[in-house]
Amino acid sequence: GLPFVGTGWYRLRFEVPERNEGRRCTLLFDGAMSHARVYVNGQEAIRWPNGYNSFHTDITPLLNPGGENLLAVRLENLPESSRWYPGAGIYRNVHLIVTDEAHVPVWGTQIITRRADEASARVRQCTALTVPQGKSPADYAIETAVTDPAGRIVARHRQSAGADFGDHCFEQEFTIDRPALWSPDTPALYTSTSEIYEGGELKDRYVTVFGIRTVEAVQGEGFRLNGKPLKFRGVCLHHDLGPLGGIVNESAIRHRIRLLKEMGCNAIRTSHNMPAPELIEICDETGMMVMAESFDEWETKKVENGYHKEFGQWAERDLVNLVRRFRNNPSVVMWCIGNEVPDQWNGDRGPKLSLRLQNICHREDPTRPVTQGMDAPDAVTANNMAAVMDIPGFNYRPHLYARNYLRLPQEMILGSETASTISSRGIYKFPVVRRSMPRYDDHQASSYDVEHCGWSNLPEDDFIQHDDRPYCMGEFVWTGFDYLGEPTPYYSDWPSHSSLFGIIDLAGIPKDRYWLYRSKWNSEAETLHILPHWNWKGREGEVTPVFIYTNYPEAELFINGRSQGRRRKDTGVTIDNSADSVSAADLKRQRRYRLMWMDTRYEPGTVKAVAYDEEGNAVAEREIRTAGEPYRIVLEADRTVIAADGKDYAFVTVRVEDRQGTPCPLADNEIRFEVTGAGYYRAGANGNPASLEPFQRPRMKLFSGMMTAVIAPTERPGTITVKATSPGLKKATVEIRSEAATQP
């Protein structure tokens, strides 16, 4: 990945008004990497080892009203503390929250959908209240108004604290007629605004965004959302944003979620840590379900300075903060307490720790099921570690699902981590055969999507499980995007620096595998994708297989106008008649989900696919062709209007075409960027897992004919002009307009 070990200090001087009496000041960190120690005027306010978690502290007693104050934050990343690139420093946002002494504390509301259908919903809100010393809760009242997605008030309730004001918590219930239920297809969000009064004086206003929906795991049936069965079409995501590193950025997250939604993905697993609040809020808005994960280690180490050193003292506090932070977010549909923890082999210790952590989740949030990703299915069914979970999650080894299902009282299995197929965008290896842990001199993997790791498999090995086994609840593929670090199977081999697992590469450009998943997961959009590219000088006359990924059942392939035959997806392939090693080597399961012409021979020209529907009607076609010499650069911005706020990035896809407009798949020209006007070049990436070109430098080589440039606005509205040049190529320019940012 990138260097991350070391110690850093942040210091901020600020003034506090002299008349600060009766006010409370709280610092909220969304995440600080890692081992944070926070000091105010030389006194330690709080420490928090976990670099991913949110934490907060009241700094009022440490302030110097009417004078200068010094906030200092010390962070330290230890060597051998992470299995992937964690980032470093204050990489998430920090908030100063100023309230009256009587106020709703941080994460002080909990909104639960007690029941919901299309006719009505019953919603309960619990609102905590912190009162000044010497005051009685009975002196206060709460008034809450609930507004629907259109901003209309649909419920209102006023309540005074009574003698039974347990734990300083107001409980209010609302009936909402004809509610808009939250789901991946209808991500409707409601807003609760609670006002705290002392007599007639407003003391605090607290806003909570929530969704009306129910979730449940039903024995023998699986997961239900709003009472309806649902299977997960999910991906695992590490938190880094490729060339931007670990720093959180809303526009980059939105860009990623948009690509995943278009693929048909409906869920994300935040592997293997607490997520950024921005990710969860965007998932709320866009209808992306979330498995919110906590730990990669419990008591037993994976790396020398990992979380196992903090688990005993900090696990409950970390888990409580995770749940309280996100318990009102409708996108979060389950909690995940661990990933492949070695404790699963430690006798009865694994089951006991599982139950302890799950019970903490249930105590803090009784509405969501709890899972964990276990990669030793035989062991965890034998020692009952899987049996104690609300939802047993298995990482890999789908061939062991059937026998372990018989030992599970829940009668369901979640593919909590699947596939780990490896590929490099635009790179193809011959001959086309299934390979485990292949290693090539160029440190790449084949985009024919037939290569995987020693513990993993190909996408269809999971597809067929979830299609043919009713007890399978769906899957979370490793991974949605390539990420910094873990370049398996090359491990520490120089110059490998990023993973090959992603369905989408580090530059945010879809690999061929994207279209395979899209053909399976997105039934609303047409998919018809041909691979490989058709520039194979030197392979004339040699066998060069052609694959088609499509959601149509049949297609015909033409090379230079000559039919290579029609292929139909083989629905006669089942999980039971394709489980042997001969079938695996023969790509038998792949025939059910992709169309393959294994004996086609290369000749320059055109490759065309014609797709047919179930009735045999030709309904779509696509053509690729052999490209000529690179001629011009093409720039395409994902958006042409962005906010002038310094952080609303535009993502510009860069490619090279020949004179006829055909993309050049082998182009590796170095592209130089010049950005003028109201913006600047923020970063770039080409998706090459073995490239050490700096992300921030405004020049980079194309990889397989493409790259992405990230353009940032200043805080001054205006026009941003991006110019790309390369010797011997026709230059390209794109303009992006940045407009004054609107205040929330």
Predicted regions and their residues:
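Extended acidic/polar, glycine-enriched regions
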Residues: 64-66, 127-218, 597-605, 613-614, ...
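Non-catalytic, glycine-rich low-complexity segments
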Residues: 1-17, 28-30, 68-136, 149, ...
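Short aromatic-acidic-glycine turn motif
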Residues: 146-155, 567-569, 574-576, 630-635, ...
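Short, hydrophobic beta-strand segments
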Residues: 59-61, 172-182, 595-601, 696-715
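Beta-strand-rich structural segments
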Residues: 125-129, 193-195, 546-550, 610-611, ...
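Short flexible loop/turn segments that cap and initiate beta-strands
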Residues: 137-143, 185-190, 551, 557-568, ...
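Extended substrate-binding grooves/exosites of carbohydrate-active enzymes
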Residues: 43, 48, 93, 101-103, ...
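Accessory beta-strand-rich segments of carbohydrate-active enzymes
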Residues: 1-110, 149, 209, 274-275, ...
